[in-house]
Amino acid sequence: MTQAQTATVQPDAIPVAAPASQRWRVADVVALFELPFNDLIFRAQQVHREHFDANAVQLSTLLSIKTGGCEEDCGYCSQSSHHDTGLKAEKLMDVDAVLDAARAAKANGASRFCMGAAWRNPKERHMPALTEMVRGVKELGLETCMTLGMLEDEQAQELANAGLDYYNHNLDTSPEFYGQVISTRTYQDRLDTLDRVRDAGINVCCGGIIGMGESRRERAGLISQLANLNPYPDSVPINNLVAIEGTPLEGTAPLDPFEFVRTIAVARITMPKAVVRLSAGREQLDDGLQAMCFLAGANSMFYGDQLLTTSNPQSQKDRALFERLGIRASDADAMQANA
């Protein structure tokens, strides 16, 4: 009796990575979301390995340099002055305090330091301190990122001249769902700021938040918008909604965690050379789901015990997970995608 052979079954033959010039229609992105889960993850991992070390993850630390009192009415945000969340508005931090936090982040293993301010846009009086923060953090050998709201051309250029590596300005969601979350800033406002950032020579960090009550098609609409930016973002943070008490999205039903993993995979396939970052809401994922996110192509995460005003898994727990998975922390230079 002959020994039975084991057949190896591969997913249907489809291109692993689309040409860089491809326009991602929403229907095309929906089709990715609707692939069988194993096929989607397999394809995303193939794309990931074409461009990155599959076992390297960049650690980023995010510091709120100006908390609360924001003029915008973003429905997910505890820092909006429109919502009663009990968060007290604070002034912009002193430069020395920011640099102390950056030193601590570096000592804890971070290679990227992000500074966030709860503003509609920075005022001119803030720019000297902001540029000093950028220069000081860069002198520590850390990659720098800021998120300060909308920018004017001159402000973007000032930050570029100071050496800012990345500017974060998220699209948040699809154009169709956007009006259900925010009314004080238009979608075009966000796109205009991204243009100013890119024109100033700063790398673009742009992603969104999922789990706000949007449909799968609307999630696909967000990914389509991001992937069709010219060029697509260098860094793509994917946030899982943290439904904060006192915000309009309080009580929103949690997103199926496998849908979050699917979103990571679709982002990797459609933006193959971008750094895909696990951001807010990571504490809602257990170790197994976080491992799936890395398998799906996430290669950066926010690291530390707090993200702006929401909690984040403890640093020691993160290090233990890395050890169990054989993942190593990567510096900024190593996160450049292969051609």
Curated annotation (Swiss-Prot):
- Keyword annotations from UniProtKB, A to Z: 2Fe-2S, 4Fe-4S, Biotin biosynthesis, Iron, Iron-sulfur, Metal-binding, S-adenosyl-L-methionine, Transferase
The record's InterPro entries line, in alphabetical order, gives: Aldolase_TIM, BATS_dom, Biotin_synth/BioAB, Biotin_synthase, Elp3/MiaA/NifB-like_rSAM, rSAM
Q: How is the cofactor bound?
A: Binds 1 [4Fe-4S] cluster. The cluster is coordinated with 3 cysteines and an exchangeable S-adenosyl-L-methionine.
Part of which pathway?
Cofactor biosynthesis; biotin biosynthesis; biotin from 7,8-diaminononanoate: step 2/2
Binding positions for [4Fe-4S] cluster per the UniProt entry: 70, 74, 77
The coiled-coil regions, if any, are none
Q: Which Pfam families match?
A: BATS, Radical_SAM
Q: Which residues bind [2Fe-2S] cluster?
A: 114, 145, 205, 277
Q: What is its EC number?
A: 2.8.1.6
- Give any GO molecular function from the UniProt entry: 2 iron, 2 sulfur cluster binding
Q: Which GO terms describe its biological process?
A: biotin biosynthetic process
Subunit annotation: Homodimer.
Its biological function?
Catalyzes the conversion of dethiobiotin (DTB) to biotin by the insertion of a sulfur atom into dethiobiotin via a radical-based mechanism.
The cross-references to HAMAP family, in alphabetical order and at most eight, read: BioB
User: Which PANTHER family does this entry report, sorted A to Z?
Assistant: BIOTIN SYNTHASE, BIOTIN SYNTHASE, MITOCHONDRIAL
Q: What is this protein called?
A: Biotin synthase
Record the organism.
Burkholderia ambifaria (strain ATCC BAA-244 / DSM 16087 / CCUG 44356 / LMG 19182 / AMMD) (Burkholderia cepacia (strain AMMD))
State the gene name recorded for this protein: bioB
